[in-house]
């Protein structure tokens, strides 16, 4: 769905949205707010790039990060869950991943991105493997 269509749909349905981003560094927030009138639905965008930001702002237990890593479905789930407590938005999104070109491992390669979506009491975690593409490709396609 294009940003234009999403923009119209969110306004029509009086739906609010918030995001917590890591590897996209605010890119999704920027796209969601590019159109006039986005203040009707966009409540907040948090860039929690570092582990410290995830721990201090989103209240992710550091034991989760040390056990599973910041790039994990577990961390992504807590990011979106805790964001929803802060934002009170109807829809909450979280993004954590490895945009590269460095930082990947065999278990967690460059291009691995988790996206969390929370609406109501339902949470969906989507695992994406973009492959070893350019950083901008991974960020723009997340």
Annotate each PLM feature.
Residues 1-142:
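Short alpha-helical segments enriched in small residues
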């Amino acid at each position: 769905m294009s940003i234009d269509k999403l923009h119209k749909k969110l306004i029509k349905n009086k739906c609010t949205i918030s995001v917590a981003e890591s590897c996209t560094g605010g890119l999704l927030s920027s796209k969601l707010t590019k159109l006039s009138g986005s203040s009707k639905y966009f409540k907040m965008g948090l860039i929690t790039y570092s582990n410290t930001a995830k721990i201090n702002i989103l209240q992710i237990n550091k034991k989760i990060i040390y056990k599973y890593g910041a790039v994990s479905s577990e961390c992504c789930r807590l990011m979106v869950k805790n964001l929803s407590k802060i934002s009170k938005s109807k829809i909450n999104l979280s993004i954590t991943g490895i945009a590269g070109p460095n930082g990947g491992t065999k278990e967690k390669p460059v291009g691995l991105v988790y996206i969390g979506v929370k609406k109501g009491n339902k949470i969906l975690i989507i695992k994406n493997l973009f492959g070893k593409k350019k950083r901008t490709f991974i960020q723009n396609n997340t």
